[in-house]
């Protein structure tokens, strides 16, 4: 059952929006920050700098790409997708169904013997 005020033509775009929103939420969920304690032989020297450098790199990358995961970017993508692919879907579907029905009726009429179906002009 559709929510009040929602037409059946809006259902595909609503499902797509929910799918995009679910992907965004799944990607933004926090990754556990606890890491296993370093092994004693790797705790000194060059390898001891790796966790700090990786944390800084991940933080910088996350900050630079934060705009991409913001609601404006997703909303813009969804709006563009709707405008390009879904806006006139109802009209295109209706036209396709009508042409398919007409084509099917013409083929069926052509297969029907004249004795049973009569001439097409008598309708």
From Swiss-Prot:
Highest taxon of the lineage: Eukaryota
InterPro entries: APOC4
Pfam families listed in its UniProt record: APOC4 (PF15119)
Record's subcellular location: Secreted
Signal peptide: 1-27
One annotated Gene Ontology cellular component of this protein: high-density lipoprotein particle
Keywords from the named record: Lipid transport, Secreted, Signal, Transport
GO BP terms, alphabetized: lipid transport; positive regulation of triglyceride storage; triglyceride homeostasis
Role description: May participate in lipoprotein metabolism.
PANTHER family per the UniProt record, alphabetical: APOLIPOPROTEIN C-IV
Record-stated family: Belongs to the apolipoprotein C4 family.
Protein name per Swiss-Prot or TrEMBL: Apolipoprotein C-IV
Organism encoding this protein: Neomonachus schauinslandi
């Amino acid at each position: 059952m559709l929510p009040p005020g929602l037409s059946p033509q809006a259902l595909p775009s609503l499902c797509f929006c929910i799918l995009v929103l679910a992907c965004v939420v799944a990607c933004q969920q926090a990754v556990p920050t606890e890491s296993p304690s370093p092994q004693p032989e790797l705790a000194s020297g060059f390898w001891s700098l790796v966790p700090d450098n990786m944390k800084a790199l991940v933080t910088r990358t996350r900050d630079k790409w934060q705009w991409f995961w913001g609601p404006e970017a997703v909303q813009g993508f969804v709006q563009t997708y709707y405008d390009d692919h879904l806006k006139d879907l109802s009209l295109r579907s209706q036209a396709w169904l009508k042409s398919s029905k007409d084509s099917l009726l013409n083929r069926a009429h052509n297969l029907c013997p004249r004795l049973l179906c009569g001439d097409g002009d008598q309708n």
